[in-house]
């Protein structure tokens, strides 16, 4: 089969399109003939060596296709099943071998392309909106980078759960995307101090939760915008890592909560994964969730 391989860390130039051995499943594994793959920022981290992985490797952690072979003891899937997955290396190929328990079934009304485009980011948005801080009607949420892959899905899920959404973006085009996803208010942080604008929009009351994937440049102001007992959900650092936080600061700002979650810890069991992926794929299939 053909695959894109990485033999040394570096930029896009280290990606090598080459022949690779056909995968053979071991016990508990399944081979998936891939029809679509998802591209994610984490792929660049693997390629550049920011997240250590053994080399050589086939990058890519998200894909969808059809099961073509199974190893001994596999009961979760069978040959011919349409499946998707997120979180296992090896997607930049015509086929990949994956632990069968990490595969999720695709509904008939969801294409492989749609599944590969939504599983990783969709499950991330799902755990943020239902796990890290379970949004409810009456909540006000501040969502940074609201026009990004996770951001657009998170805005939609927040609205499904009845929250008021204040979104930050950087450009006119992204403002339109965030509004199209349902954001109630959109703040252009390049033109406006988002802290002052959120204070104005909330009559200085603040918000129940901040979802922050930006990190260094937004974190401190986000803490200032939380209501007493509010929650800061820091799930990324596109502007750089956040400095160490003195726990006393959380008390001083109103007994607020801080969490730094990852998808891995919200899909530890097959039941967790089937629940999150199942809801996301159902929303895609029924048109409740728009995937770009």
Q: Where are the language model's segments positioned?
A:
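Glycine-rich phosphate-binding loop and adjacent beta-alpha segment
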Residues: 169, 217-289
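Short glycine-centered segments of the SAM/dcSAM-binding site in methyltransferase folds
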Residues: 82, 140, 164, 230-231, ...
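NAD(P)H dinucleotide-binding glycine-rich loop of Rossmann-like/cofactor-binding domains
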Residues: 36, 45, 84-147
């Amino acid at each position: 089969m053909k695959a894109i391989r990485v033999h040394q860390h570096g930029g896009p130039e280290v990606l090598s399109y080459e022949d690779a051995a056909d995968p053979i499943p071991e016990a508990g594994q399944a081979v998936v003939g891939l029809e679509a793959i998802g591209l994610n920022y984490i792929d660049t981290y693997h390629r550049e060596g920011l997240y250590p992985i053994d080399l050589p490797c086939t990058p890519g952690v998200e894909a969808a296709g059809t099961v073509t072979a199974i190893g001994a003891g596999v009961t979760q899937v069978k040959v011919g099943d349409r499946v998707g997955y997120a979180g296992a290396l090896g997607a930049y190929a015509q086929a990949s071998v994956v632990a069968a328990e990490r595969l999720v079934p695709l509904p008939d009304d969801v294409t492989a392309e749609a599944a590969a485009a939504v599983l990783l980011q969709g499950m991330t948005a799902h755990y943020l909106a239902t796990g890290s801080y379970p949004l409810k009607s009456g909540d006000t949420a501040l969502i940074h980078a609201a026009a990004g892959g996770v951001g657009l899905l998170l805005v939609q899920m927040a609205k499904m759960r009845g929250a008021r959404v204040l979104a930050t973006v950087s450009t006119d085009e992204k403002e339109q995307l965030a509004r199209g996803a349902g954001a109630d208010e959109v703040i252009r942080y390049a033109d406006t101090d988002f802290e002052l604008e959120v204070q104005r929009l909330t009559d200085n009351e603040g918000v129940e939760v901040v979802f922050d994937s930006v990190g260094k440049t937004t974190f401190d102001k986000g803490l200032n915008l939380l209501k007493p007992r509010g929650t800061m959900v820091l799930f990324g650092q596109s502007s750089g890592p956040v400095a160490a936080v003195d726990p006393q600061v959380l008390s001083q700002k109103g007994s607020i909560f801080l969490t730094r979650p990852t998808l891995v810890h919200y899909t530890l069991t097959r039941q967790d994964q089937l629940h999150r992926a199942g809801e996301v794929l159902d929303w895609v299939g029924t048109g409740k969730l728009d995937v770009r």
